[in-house]
From Swiss-Prot:
Expressed in epidermal cells of primary and lateral roots, root-shoot junction zone, vascular tissues of adventitious root primordia, stems and coleoptiles of germinating seeds. GO terms for cellular component: plasma membrane. Pfam families: NAR2. Heterotetramer composed of two NRT2.1, NRT2.2 or NRT2.3 and two NAR2.1. Interacts with NRT2.1, NRT2.2 and isoform 1 of NRT2.3. Acts as a dual component transporter with NTR2.1, NRT2.2 and NRT2.3. Required for high-affinity nitrate transport. Involved in the regulation of NRT2.1, NRT2.2 and NRT2.3 expression, and in both, HATS (high-affinity transport system) and LATS (low-affinity transport system) activities in plant roots. Imports nitrate with high affinity when expressed with NTR2.1, NTR2.2 or NTR2.3 in a heterologous system (Xenopus oocytes). It comes from Oryza sativa subsp. japonica. This is High-affinity nitrate transporter-activating protein 2.1. The keyword Membrane applies. The gene is NAR2.1.
Length: 206
């Protein structure tokens, strides 16, 4: 009986302690919901590729620049702590592809899936040279930059024109070095088969 009472007391203590611990779900729910349409377009964003220009994943570099729009009032960037830059599918590359669907709710948006960089915000202008990642698929893209406050919440944005998108040629097929290795292996296999064929033939002749 005493043992059961001890177990019950321990369970009660654990329940009381657990009541004061924030649950992961509650913490996630506390994350600020942000809508693109509610954000001021306070950043001017530029990219080096011209409209329709093709850059190759894993090889070419895209230069991204951003600055505060000159039409913004003084102090408009007071809350800006960092700039988060993303590569986004252009409208033409989202058609009939639900997994690339754009959403006004940034937490549900699938158009801007690829991180380019996160940089501390500096008054004036910023720049980053992005080597296109090897896993970027073939598609048309534009670049979007978010100004982020101290809490990590997006408070403003800017983007290159989706209608002036550039194209990325993704890595497809077999890499050249793999082709060479496969060729060497095939040659070795044929030579080995020929050798064993000759050996077996000589054994039979004897």
């Amino acid at each position: 009986m005493a043992r059961l009472a001890g177990v019950a007391a321990l369970s009660l203590v654990l329940v009381l302690l657990g009541a004061g611990v924030p649950r992961p779900a509650a913490a996630a729910a506390a994350k600020t919901q942000v809508f693109l349409s509610k954000l001021p377009k306070a950043l001017v964003v530029g990219v080096s590729p011209k409209h329709g220009e093709v850059v190759h994943a894993g090889e070419n570099t895209v230069t991204v620049t951003w600055s505060l729009n000159t039409s913004e009032p003084a102090g408009a960037d007071a809350a800006f702590k960092s700039v988060k830059v993303k590569l986004c599918y252009a409208p033409a590359s989202r058609t009939d592809r639900g997994w690339r669907k754009a959403s006004d709710d940034l937490h549900k948006d699938k158009a801007c899936q690829f991180k380019v960089t996160v940089q501390p915000y500096a008054a004036g202008a910023g720049r980053f040279d992005y080597v296109v990642a090897r896993d970027i698929p073939t598609a048309s893209y534009f670049v979007r930059a978010y100004a982020v406050d101290a809490s990590g919440t997006e408070v403003a944005y800017g983007q290159s024109s989706p209608d002036a998108a550039f194209d990325v040629a993704g890595i497809t097929g077999i890499h050249a070095s793999l082709k060479v290795a496969a060729g060497v292996f095939s040659t070795f296999s044929i030579a080995a088969l020929a050798f064993f064929f000759v050996v077996e033939k000589r054994k039979k002749d004897k």
